[in-house]
Each structure stands twice: as C-alpha cells, then as structure tokens.
Amino acid sequence: MAGLLSTFDTFSSRRSESINKSGGGAVIPGQRSTVSVFVLGPSVTDDADKLFIATTFLAHSLDTDKQHSQRGGFLVSLLAMAYSSPELYLTTNGVNADVKYVIYNIEKDPKRTKTDGFIVKTRDMEYERTTEWLFGPMVNKSPLFQGQRVAADPDTLLQTYGYPACLGAIIVQVWIVLVKAITSSAGLRKGFFNRLEAFRQDGTVKGALVFTGETVEGIGSVMRSQQSLVSLMVETLVTMNTARSDLTTLEKNIQIVGNYIRDAGLASFMNTIKYGVETKMAALTLSNLRPDINKLRSLIDTYLSKGPRAPFICILKDPVHGEFAPGNYPALWSYAMGVAVVQNKAMQQYVTGGTYLDMEMFLLGQAVAKDAESKISSALEDELGVTDTAKERLRHHLANLSGGDGAYHEPTGGGAIEVALDNADIDLETEAHADQDARGWGGESGERWARQVSGGHFVTLHGAERLEEETNDEDVSDIERRIAMRLAERRQEDSATHGDEGRNNGVDHDEDDDAAAVAGIGGI
C-alpha cells in the first residue's frame, strides 16, 4: 500500500516530465518575419547627433501608422545603442524563432544637405528612400517626454549630464515598462511611475526626460504584441547574470530593473510557498491539502528545470506558465493567503478574491496564524536553546498583541463577494469547551452584523464567540471539524430565523444565502 501511495504522490511531477519530454523526430522551422534594425556607424561621433537618433527611434516606435514589427525594430535599435558593438549584442541575445534581424548602418556625411547629413547604408549600397523615411518630417501625436511640455532643452541636458546619462535615462525607462507590460497591462501606467520613483530620486532619470503616460502605454502595446522584443530583453538579463562582471552603470541599472521583472506573474506561486509551506504550521497535515502540496512539488520541479530562464516563464509566455496559476492548487493557495494577511499587513492589499478561493481554508489560515502555538517553530527551539519559561513569555506577548484584533480579514479584489467577518473568532479550545460553547452560543454573545455589501444586503454572523485567553494544544483535524460544525450550526440557525426576520424587517434573506453560497461559506 505504501508503494501505491508513493506512486500517486509522484504522479503529478512525472506526468509533467513526460509531457515536456521531446518526442524526437525532425525539427521543422516555423515562419520568421524580417525586422530592420538600425545601428550607428563610426562616422556618427557627435553626442547631440546620437541623442537625436535615440529620440528618433523612440518616436518611430510610438507611431501607430507603422506595423508593430517595425515599431519593435525601432525599440531594438534603441536598446542596442547601449553597446559599443550592437551587432554582437544582437548576435548574442537576438537569436529568435520568430524574427530575423537585418542590420542597417546610419552614417553621417558632412556633404549631404538633406536629412541632417544622415544616410542609411550597408556595406554594398546606400538607401536613400529609407533615409528619407527614417529622418523625414514626423508629427508626434503627443510629447515623448514630460519635459517637452515645459519646453525643456535636450541640448542643455546633454551639456550638463552628458550623453551616456541621457541615453541611459531613456533606455532604463523602456526596461521599466517591461515590468508590468506583459503581466499587468491594466496597471501599466501606475506601476511604471511607482518603479520609476527610485530612479528619479537617485538622479538616474532626470525630470525633463521622464516618459509621458502616452509614451509608456505605446511602448507597452508594442511589447505585448512583439514577443521577440521581450525575448531579446530577457536574454540580455540572462547573459548579464552569467557571463560578465564588468558591467557599465547602465547595465547595472538594467539589472536593478531586472529584479522587478524576475518572477513577474508568479506572485501567487511564490507567496503560496512562502506563507503556505515555509511557515511549517501543522495545518499542512490536512488531507485535503495533500493533492495541492503534490501539485506544488511538481511545479517546483518544473520551475527549476527551466534553468536561468525560470523567473521569466510568464513574460516569455512559456507553455507551462498557466500551470502556475493559483486555480491549480486552490486549497493550499487559499490557506496561504489566510496566513499571509495575518503575518504581513501589506498582503491585506493583495488580490485574494477569485472563483477558486476556498473560504474555509482562507479562514483556517488566519486562525492558525493567530494562534500563539502555531507561531512558535519547534524546529528552532533546541537550536536556539529556548527555555520553557521563555516560550511561555513569548506566548503571553503574542496573545497580548493579537488579543485586540479578533476580526477576520475578508478577501479583496477579484470577483469575490465582500464578506466582512467582524470579530468572528474560530474557537481553538478543547472538544469539551467547544460543545459547551455551542450549546450556549446564541444567548450569551448576541448578534453581530457585518458592514453593508453591494445590493443593500448584509452577511451576518450570529453570536460569534471570542477566543479564550489561554488556548490548549489540539490537533488540526479538530480545528477543521470545529469550523465545519460552526458553519453547519449557523446554517441551521439562519434557516430557522430567516422567515420571521424577513417578515419583521423586509430584508430579502434568500439573496443573502445566494451571496454567501457564491462566496463559498454556506449559509452564514
């Protein structure tokens, strides 16, 4: 029997391995599009000319009259300006199954009177029409930088800060757009300016060169449509981490932005590990968490198998990235979010609402996180030499800290119905106390009402009890059973009282039951 159970435990990970394993056979290349990339030739030496070309690339990347592949090519041209050898940069990082980059040089000819003396050429020929298309008159639909709205002079910035700093400010902002462009496009503009603030404060990005909101949205739309551009940027981060130690200031700033890009779209997966598993609370022994734990183990194996590109599986749209969504391990995720909103106040703003939210596990996570016994790690007691007296004092302090806040946090955001659990403490007392409290529950503690929710109705919790100051140790299965018992009793009491209450106050409690059922908490 033990061998059979171990087979089931490892099935999830072995299944993922078999799905992702190559089936052999011939590799048939797919269709690739051709993208033009422009690089500076050796004759372009003036810093003012270089900055002008950089802003020209940026303007073309925002031109909605051009195809997205062309706009993506201009962003690649802009990113390549950070390197002394753009050709080597593209050869190292730009190998892609979707596109083939064709490189054109931009040279400066003092004898030319048109297009500011610039000419687009290759080793064999010059491209007059392409030059006019690239450097001809353009009508910007909106300013590129916020400084253009107050008539800031780029030449003054160039003389004050130098070309590398000005170019770096532009390129760093393109990288910041990538942080939210793929995984959270709705919050792109807000997320961009939040991340930018640190670079504003340290002087990396000058106020006159800050992108406008329209520029941010335009770059984000190109990134979402041009996966080859995103792949190039990810490969840039990978090669920075593995190949070089002599990074320029711009490259170091790109690495800082890369820390925000890593694991983008994997917050649910990482938070489930952090708050659900690494806290090592006894609730992990529950049988209904076992399948999700096995699933999480399989996902960890999949993540590690991706090597240095693992943190980018979401923005790279790796076929396996959907497996990391919390809907694939809902019970464990719900439990972890319950622990998180208690242990980390910032997590109370995290979106925990969703159709896959298991309300009972969400409440259980909060209950065990509030329990002083669960907060003490037995694994560290011997290592740290903690005495029994010290543990008792610690329990006392923890009880005092949490005693004033008995409220349960409700799920936020998503599609969840707001369910306010006002001081609805789950009793962690012994079985005898639980039975005694259940019998005298309604008359002793009265009725508490949650705040109003949409539709003008209320979700009520009748006679929710307070925790006793001193809590005895008990098995987690007892906790789970007690939660189920409380919910069942509240359903029975509500069903018995709904008829009279409806006649007395005219409230439609049938809709309350429907709302509560949708929220996953029965007939509270």
From Swiss-Prot:
Most abundant protein in the virion. There are 2564 molecules per encapsidated genome. RNA binds at residues 180, 190, 195, 260, 350. Changing residue 313 to F: Complete loss of in vitro replication. No effect on homomultimerization. The keyword Ribonucleoprotein applies. Ncore is globular and carries regions required for self-assembly and RNA-binding. Ntail is an intrinsically disordered monomeric domain in the C-terminus. Changing residue 324 to V: Unstable form with complete loss of homomultimerization and replication. Changing residue 260 to D: Alters homomultimerization. Complete loss of in vitro replication. This is Nucleoprotein. It is found in: Virion; Host cytoplasm. GO terms for biological process: negative stranded viral RNA transcription. Residues 462-471 are annotated as: Interaction with the phosphoprotein.
